[in-house]
């Protein structure tokens, strides 16, 4: 998986490493500046995930739990009368598999973060197939209210897309306590799904309290670690 899905490839390799080194940590990173040579564009970004193995003594509560990304090839499905399009079948299988890899049911999914965009030549096909899939797979899911379209806001983010959406999924699961589906829609022949599971204790956003990262430019770039077990207090959006 490359292009906007490159981060999923890096993340899968990182999770593979932790499977064989459960007491260690690994970094997964993606970045891109698709508008280069223009600079200071909102679609240039970098995300670094510091992942801990299940037996790593971090002395911190997890922000969230990540399942493996799952991808399915549309060519592996048949186009038949009375059946949904092959892309929808591939999405259905990928989402079910991704949920299982996160030890969840697909019906547990409470939010969607995706990269279908709204100006790309394939945006309509991306959105249509994903929306059709979730409408059938999760009948109570409100696609408009329960989703965030990253590239509709920032523009095409290139190789910086996948892990940016995973990071947003971590934040949503952490604060709202619901599993999040991260969908990689850019390859219409091979959709990618990943489920982020929430921690045991969610930390709801308190709108009446300060948000640490809004205090200044330097604070915005500080790492967001899991809350230390010995932390005397909790700052929204930050832990030492």
Q: Which residue stretches match the model-derived regions?
A:
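Condensing-enzyme catalytic core mediating Claisen C-C bond formation in acyl metabolism
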Residues: 34, 38-97, 197-240
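Membrane-proximal bilayer-interacting regions
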Residues: 156-162, 169-170, 174-182, 188-189
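Conserved beta-ketoacyl condensing-enzyme motif
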Residues: 1-2, 98-130, 137-138
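A contiguous, mid-protein "functional segment" used to position or interact
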Residues: 182-206
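Conserved catalytic cysteine-centered active-site region
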Residues: 1-22, 27-29, 129-164
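Well-ordered, non-membrane alpha-helical segments in soluble/globular domains
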Residues: 11-12, 84-98, 122-134, 163-167
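Cysteine-clustered segments with highest specificity for TGF-beta superfamily mature ligands
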Residues: 25-29, 178-183
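Short acidic, S/G/P-rich loop/turn micro-motifs used as interaction or catalytic elements
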Residues: 5-10, 33-38, 86, 117-122, ...
């Amino acid at each position: 998986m490359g292009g906007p899905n490159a981060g999923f490839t890096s993340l899968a390799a990182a999770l593979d490493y932790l499977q064989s080194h459960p007491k260690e940590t690994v970094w997964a990173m993606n970045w891109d500046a698709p508008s280069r040579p223009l600079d200071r564009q909102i679609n240039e970004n970098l995300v670094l995930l510091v992942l801990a193995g299940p037996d790593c003594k971090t002395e911190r509560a997890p922000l969230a739990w990540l399942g493996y990304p799952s991808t399915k090839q549309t060519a592996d499905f048949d186009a038949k009368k009375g059946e949904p399009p092959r892309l929808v079948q591939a999405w259905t299988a990928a989402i079910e598999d991704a949920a299982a890899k996160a030890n969840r049911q697909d019906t547990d999914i409470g939010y969607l973060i995706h990269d279908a965009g709204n100006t790309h030549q394939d945006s309509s096909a991306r959105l249509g197939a994903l929306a059709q899939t979730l409408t059938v797979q999760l009948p109570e899911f409100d696609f408009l209210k329960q989703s965030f379209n990253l590239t509709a806001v920032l523009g095409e983010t290139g190789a910086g897309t996948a892990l940016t959406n995973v990071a947003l999924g971590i934040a949503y699961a952490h604060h709202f306590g619901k599993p999040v589906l991260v969908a990689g829609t850019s390859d219409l022949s091979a959709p990618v799904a990943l489920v982020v599971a929430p921690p045991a204790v969610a930390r709801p956003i308190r709108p009446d309290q300060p948000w640490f990262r809004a205090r200044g430019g330097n604070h915005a770039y500080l790492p967001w670690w899991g809350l230390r077990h010995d932390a005397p207090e909790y700052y929204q959006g930050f832990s030492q």
